[in-house]
């Protein structure tokens, strides 16, 4: 993938204003071919309860991630409520080769993902159209 294409995609990601935003979900689908990251969005400096950002990594050639399971002691991520979700610290794209790019994602709590994919897309979606794992929890 060419450098200017990577810069354009990085700009689109940066426009989500993801820094310190809550990660509403992370999905790895189709045996790792697609990875979707759902990020809380803001409207006029307030959390947008209707919409969120969906950053999709498509045609993934490699996926590597580390979690904070060793540091979490007894609680499980599946038991998180919306107020206890991870926040995003960094999403950076870089050249990998002519067809792929490398993405590094850092979430607070020592969670790190490295993804080599053919494409990255960014879209704003309605939260009501997605069944987040933390819904309906106290």
Spans of model-derived segments:
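Surface-exposed, interaction-prone regions used to assemble/regulate multi-protein complexes
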Residues: 1-138
